[in-house]
Amino acid sequence: MENKKINIIENFLSKEECDYIINNHKNGKSLDLTHISEKIVEVLNDNFKFRGYELGDLEHLLFKEYTPKTKYSLKWNVNNESYFTIIVQLNDNFDNGYHQYLLNDDEKYFQSPKITGSLVFFFSNIKHRLSPVESDFKYILETEIKLLESPEFKKTLI
């Protein structure tokens, strides 16, 4: 874990699992990634306790490919619709292409390392962006998750 806002778990997937996902995608084969979704939810539940809330359903895992030809905007993005944004880095053999996170308004940012198989999850309201990939291809899986009010939670006034 890096900090409480941006969390990195190395070896979430093995290099072999990542290569399998990339190669199947390149060959046009669809994959059932349910086991990865379940593993993500397990990690979130193990690392966070949500008083009065529970994790909603994980959005569909999207396979994303970035190249030097991808059009990039270096403006900071924010997603206020979800609670967490989740990225699984499938490879690290490309130049630049860093996920960057603005943690305060003085333009200093945290840059997550490029590590094959790592899981990065962060609060979706954090300003974030991707620096341009300068060579080769960057492959990730990306999804989001919302929090739902827990039906079992009893609200009380103190």
What are the residue ranges of the model-derived segments?
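Fe(II)/2-oxoglutarate oxygenase catalytic core
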Residues: 1-119, 125-158
